[in-house]
Amino acid sequence: MPIQKPRPLATLALLALFTSQANAETARPTEPGDAGAYLAAQYASAENDFRAAVGLYDRALATDGQNATLLDGAILANIGIGDIAKAAKLAVAFEALGGKSQQSYLAIMAERAKAGDFAAILENTKNDPGVGALFNGLVKAWAELGNGDMTKALAGFDAVAATPGLESFGLFHKALALASAGDFEGAEVIFSAKKGTQLTLDRRGVLAFVQVLSQLERNPDALSLMDKTFGQVTEPAIVDLRRRLTAGEPIPFDVVRNSTDGIAEVFSTLGSALNGQAETNYVLLYARIANHLRPDNSDAVLLTAEQLEKLGQHDLAAEAYGAITPDDPSYYVAEIGRAATTRAAGRKEAAIEILQALARSHGDVLAVQNALGDGLRRDEHFAEAIKAYDTAVAMLGTPNSSHWSLFYSRGICNDQLKNWDLAESDFRMALKLEPDQPQVLNYLGYSFVDRGINLDEALGMIERAVAARPDEGFIVDSLAWALFRMGRFDEALAPMEKASLLEPVDAVVTDHLGDVYWSVGRKREADFQWRRALSFEPDEADATRIRHKLAVGLDAVIAEETAVPTPAAEATVAPVEPATDGN
């Protein structure tokens, strides 16, 4: 049973069950008393600067506390910073003025769930402002369970499951409800698809199934499920769970302990399902509330932080990641995320310090060493990066296709340190693991051309990379530059012009275009492109060479470099950043 995200079509069907993410209905807006604060709050909200927006809305509300427009904006801003309790108070005031919005509805729902006021939740679902049948159906079922009526709860989950496109959501939550009530046999029937419907479980769903099997004294089956799902993943939490199952330890069911947890799981389930499909702010709304109701659900914390990163709110994202404590199995994942968002905020040294500290506490985790290597490589500390990558490689055992980026990244470092033999070995290993990986094909092929070796193999590699990524400018540039370096100037022209269209403000690509124009006799155009390249602020070595070409022409520069090789004569390949795979 592989871990999967919802299929795009299924997610589109899910989205169709949600109405517009805008307010369904608000009270008649009135002119705010502090117009300056109101306008500034609106601007901050539009920029997703939730913290600034909260302060500005507070200021505006201090002079006009009965303004529904201000209240509704403040609700959303407070949810953005994670203050659900304050958002709920604002929501009560907003609805007292006749206002209705999804954020007010969800904030009030969250506080009632946290307080265990399930009767109020059942009453509240009658006033849905447009959240949708899926959310309300699941929440009502959990609230019925919280009220002590299992029959109505199960009927509610069944009603959701009977809705076209929602069967898996209804069945999954029904299984969780049964397990939370101690009916592990009933939960296992659903998880095992004994009634014909195979659920597609995410990581948390698989762990719930594992716990159910363990409670049924079926640890060997639980281990088999883990092997099938996670393979040889070295994640500490998975390793520890395997150890406990192997020792015969009964694993308690704690994914959902009560109805409040169940409602938290509704927010988490829908937030995860909508991630990447709905607007980021909308996903954040669900993730923040899931995190509020279940602070120990690290998946909800990570989902929250991910949305904040997407919105460019790196300080808030770092705070979210920082909420996961060192004793949590997801701590190392959170710290890697905190380092990434810290780096994105421009604090590169602080990001490296986070990773170095993590390597001291979790140095036996492959993903940690890989992340440290990546961070050091990006800051051009290549020798230190290689040490981290070496440590990661030593942990691999038998490498598989998911490890290609580790060898690719180490190869880049070796190349930058002029250790070409080691670099080539790493690149070839990356291709052995992932033969059609365009980033590796591009880098290795370009490097061969740059050195004047293995030219036929090099051109074939680059052509395969272009076939896989025809609209990636740097890879198309590699093809053109390879043809240029092989003296096939006319053939280089078309891909070089395409690369320039794809990367119109890149100094290296523009410089290359000038060289190709010069070589096919279009010297005025070459001069123009070289001057453009200078305007894009290339590094100093490239800038010096471009200025020399403008002064004496490309032929003279090449003649000089051929007579006395210099570092400036070497064309460089711009590596495409390997995808982060967490391995």
Task: Name these PLM-found stretches.
Residues 29-37, 64-71, 97-106, 128-139, ...:
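Generic helix N-cap/helix-start motif at coil->alpha-helix transitions
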Residues 59-62, 93-96, 130, 161-162, ...:
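Conserved structural position within tetratricopeptide repeats
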Residues 22-92, 99-103, 114, 123, ...:
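N-terminal leader/linker segments that initiate helical-solenoid repeat arrays
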Residues 48, 82, 116, 148, ...:
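Residue-level detector of the short coil/turn that links helix A to helix B
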Residues 45, 79, 113, 145, ...:
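Position-specific recognition of the canonical hydrophobic site in helix A of tetratricopeptide repeat
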Residues 42, 76, 110, 142, ...:
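Residue-level recognition of tetratricopeptide repeat
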